[in-house]
């Protein structure tokens, strides 16, 4: 499970396998935590959020079944976004209050590649909000599909 961390927080990774621990370490490095000392293997790994694939996200949006939260930074979103998505950079979720974006629908978080979406979904789940991340792919994969993608200033 991912959580929002401060730069000086100590991190302890619990994992079922070495591969799972390595995957967690890669995710932490992807968001700027470069000094990792190790991990602890456990028999039962923590509860996880089930990821959403791009194709599933398309269907959920067609059915108006979810709210998409774009957790990228403003300059990234300015390059383009999914119409109807809510913008909330992942690093601001705690400060702004996770409940400020809850509207009764399940939430799907998305970023450029998946790392920040995983963190954001975990913050939301910890706040009692039904949230799932797009972990495999992200905005680039959405942009590559034939589904609607809006560039800022294009209406």
Give the label of every model feature segment.
Residues 1-67, 71-155:
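Rhodanese-like catalytic fold shared by cysteine-dependent sulfurtransferases
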């Amino acid at each position: 499970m991912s959580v929002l961390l401060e730069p000086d927080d100590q991190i302890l990774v619990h994992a079922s396998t070495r591969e799972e621990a390595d995957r967690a370490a890669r995710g932490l490095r992807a968001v700027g935590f470069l000094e990792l000392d190790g991990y602890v293997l456990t028999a039962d790994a923590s509860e996880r959020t089930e990821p959403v694939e791009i194709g599933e996200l398309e269907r959920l949006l067609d059915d108006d079944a979810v709210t998409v939260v774009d957790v990228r930074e403003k300059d990234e979103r300015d390059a383009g976004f999914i119409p109807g998505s809510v913008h909330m950079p992942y690093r601001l979720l705690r400060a702004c209050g996770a409940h400020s974006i809850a509207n009764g629908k399940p939430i799907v978080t998305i970023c450029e590649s998946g790392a920040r979406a995983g963190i954001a979904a975990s913050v939301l789940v910890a706040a009692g909000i039904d949230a799932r991340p797009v972990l495999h792919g992200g905005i680039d994969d959405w942009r590559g599909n034939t589904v609607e993608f809006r560039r800022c200033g294009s209406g």
